[in-house]
């Protein structure tokens, strides 16, 4: 072996396979220059199978013979086409718009609901506009039922609210007529505050714009002046419409004490005024004056009762009239309920018992309505006023 290696010239390769081994994959493929027919196809398939990389995505069986390759080529192409059709879904065709039908489409069974928020808002706005036009014309429109159990019948609610407001206005009107005795209150009574006004009115309706105190006044007043002059000047400076109340204050406590209270009121108003008990608004100058009057230790409780006796009496009459009005409304409702009841002919006992109880209740209501007016409260029985917000005078 050594001789053979020594006899070899430089650059000459050995013919034995032991010296150098060549991998089958490293050997170049030797193809004939001219190929024809089956030999060319067989060589092409061998080359493709040898050079094809290993793929785990799709596994294709190797083809052994040319006959099987020709017979299976059509089946393989059909299989690939079927798989490709499964992977790609064609886009749905748009449906033509149908005029004369509602824009809301019924939900498709098994389909996903489209979250079209602004479309739903626009649709509700259009329905509200249509319902408003129908309400103006005296017709009732349809309500959107897309929210199912959360649907709010706003048309019915609006109608019921309107009827309730009209019923409340009628009751207030009847109460005002009863309290005024069927007469319209004159302007003089309104200025003096002697007219019977309905209770629980808004503050702006009762007071209007808050008056500002006139600090200078028209002229100077002293303790030697007449009570009429002092009361008139105090009412002017306080912008108080209830002049008779100020006149009673001056008559009971005297000119000197009334002027001192006026000076204290001016000082409080210049420092910002006083709030009422709940703190929702400031007192009027007249309210500050009367609040200082009730909180002055030198003025006795008997004097305060004498000053506010008429106001307490009016408040009592107003409450009494309101209570009587509520009783009348309750009696009317009871009569309507009795008329709407249907008793069974066999149940005579329950019918007689109910009828006797109802007649007694209605008789008591009629007696309370037909009874004479009660005597006015005496000075000892007058309602005591602990706070200024108990009266409707500020």
Swiss-Prot record:
Superkingdom per UniProt = Eukaryota
Instruction: Tell me which residues bear Phosphoserine.
Output: 14, 16, 65-66, 69, 73, 226, 356, 368
Q: What is this protein called?
A: Phosphorylated adapter RNA export protein
Q: What does this protein do?
A: A phosphoprotein adapter involved in the XPO1-mediated U snRNA export from the nucleus. Bridge components required for U snRNA export, the cap binding complex (CBC)-bound snRNA on the one hand and the GTPase Ran in its active GTP-bound form together with the export receptor XPO1 on the other. Its phosphorylation in the nucleus is required for U snRNA export complex assembly and export, while its dephosphorylation in the cytoplasm causes export complex disassembly. It is recycled back to the nucleus via the importin alpha/beta heterodimeric import receptor.
Q: Which residues carry this modification: Phosphothreonine?
A: 296
Residue ranges of region Necessary for interaction with CBP80?
Answer: 2-329
Q: Which UniProt keywords apply?
A: Acetylation, Cytoplasm, Nucleus, Phosphoprotein, Protein transport, RNA-binding, Transport
Q: Which GO terms describe its molecular function?
A: mRNA cap binding complex binding; RNA binding; toxic substance binding
Key word Acyltransferase present in the record?
Answer: no
Subcellular localization: Nucleus, Nucleoplasm; Nucleus, Cajal body; Cytoplasm
Residues that the record marks as modified (N-acetylalanine) are 2
GO BP terms: namely:
protein transport; RNA stabilization; snRNA export from nucleus
* Provenance organism: Homo sapiens (Human)
Q: Acidic residues compositional bias: what residue ranges?
A: 1-18
| Assigned protein family | Belongs to the PHAX family.
Q: Give the classification, highest ranks.
A: Eukaryota, Metazoa, Chordata, Craniata, Vertebrata
Record GO cellular component, one term: ribonucleoprotein complex
PTM text: Phosphorylated in the nucleus. Dephosphorylated in the cytoplasm.
Q: Where is the composition biased (Basic and acidic residues)?
A: 183-193
